[in-house]
């Protein structure tokens, strides 16, 4: 066997949504800010994303992360996230998993019963809190970037279907739609149809309008489509599944999507400040969310959302690349 590259990772999941944290084999990432570092990765390190996200080492639903030095003077560290299509601007389930893995493996030093972390992401500063007992993390909460409704009640016409979506930002831009518009339930049996509609809705919106953050040009485009449904469990508020990137299914309630959903509910007076919002996902996992404070992003009313969940480590891996392998960059099915 010939080996040209070796990568080490720690894998975890949050309500079934994977996160592969790359702990070894990453070259220097250049850039002063996390957005600049993201742009550098997109241009120079996309081979690394393909190797570790694609089959045979990953799969269509894999998600990844690189922990970087902080970009700002007061942050503890930075994060860069990746998926089947490229490099994302923020990832809520990723924050929950990174903090859990960091504490439970001794990567992060902690004191007391609750630890605060300041994290630089391409979307902005995120503050996370871990509640733990010894080396076991019980839950992680994060205060996300200011989240807001970009456009309400956007009319959509696809084939014979006419409906409306809300476009909201929660670290990335999402279109929010009721699954009942298509006669679908957020369940495994309807997932293929939901994926199909997710792709169509994303393509339609991006063909009709430019969606761009008012303060940061690097934050633009529809990242995902959130399909909302009635919950299965009595303690949940809503059920959802998010289709993002290239038809990728978020198994978790989606942290940035939950933040966007909190913003839409608050804007429609369906969620009050301090009220607990329980977001259920397709695997029946749950995130808790709430509005911590009200703020503004340029001319948009915004909220600072808090999202809480937990994660579990699934493995410690060492991946190699053999230069003789015609599939050493990987491939993607799905």
From Swiss-Prot:
Catalytic residues (UniProt): 91 (proton acceptor)
Binding site for substrate: 92-93, 250, 255-256
Keyword vocabulary terms for this entry: Lyase
Disulfide bonds: none
One Pfam family matching this protein: Pro_racemase
Family: Belongs to the proline racemase family.
Protein name: Trans-3-hydroxy-L-proline dehydratase
EC code: 4.2.1.77
Superkingdom: Bacteria
């Amino acid at each position: 066997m010939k080996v040209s590259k070796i990568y080490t990772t720690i894998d975890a999941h949050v309500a079934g949504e994977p996160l592969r944290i790359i702990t070894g084999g990453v070259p220097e990432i250049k850039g002063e800010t996390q957005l600049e570092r993201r742009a550098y990765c997109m241009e120079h390190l996309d081979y690394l994303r393909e190797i570790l996200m694609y089959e045979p080492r990953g799969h269509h639903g894999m998600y990844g992360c690189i922990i970087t030095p902080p970009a700002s003077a007061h942050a503890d560290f930075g994060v860069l996230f990746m998926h089947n299509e490229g490099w994302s601007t923020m990832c809520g389930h990723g924050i929950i998993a990174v903090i859990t893995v960091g504490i439970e493996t001794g990567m992060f030093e902690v004191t007391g019963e609750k630890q605060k972390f300041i994290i630089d992401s391409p979307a902005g500063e995120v503050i996370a809190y871990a509640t733990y007992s010894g080396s076991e993390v019980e839950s992680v909460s994060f205060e996300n970037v200011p989240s807001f409704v970009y456009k309400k009640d956007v009319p959509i016409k696809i084939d014979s279907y006419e409906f409306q979506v809300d476009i909201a930002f929660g670290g990335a831009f999402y279109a929010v739609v009721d699954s009942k518009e298509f006669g679908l339930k957020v369940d495994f049996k309807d997932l293929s149809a939901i994926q199909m509609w997710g792709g169509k809705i994303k393509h339609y919106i991006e063909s009709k309008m430019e969606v761009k953050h008012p303060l940061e040009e690097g934050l633009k485009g529809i990242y995902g489509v959130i399909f909302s449904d009635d919950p299965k469990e009595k303690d949940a508020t809503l059920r959802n599944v998010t289709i993002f990137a290239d038809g990728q299914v978020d198994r978790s309630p989606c942290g940035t999507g939950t933040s966007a959903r909190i913003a839409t509910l608050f804007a429609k007076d369906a969620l009050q400040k301090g009220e607990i919002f329980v977001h259920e996902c397709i695997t029946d996992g749950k995130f808790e969310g709430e509005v911590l404070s009200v703020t503004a992003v340029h001319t948009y009313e915004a909220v600072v959302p808090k999202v809480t969940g937990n994660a579990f480590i699934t493995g410690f891996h060492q991946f190699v690349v053999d230069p003789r392998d015609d599939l050493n960059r990987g491939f993607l099915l799905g």
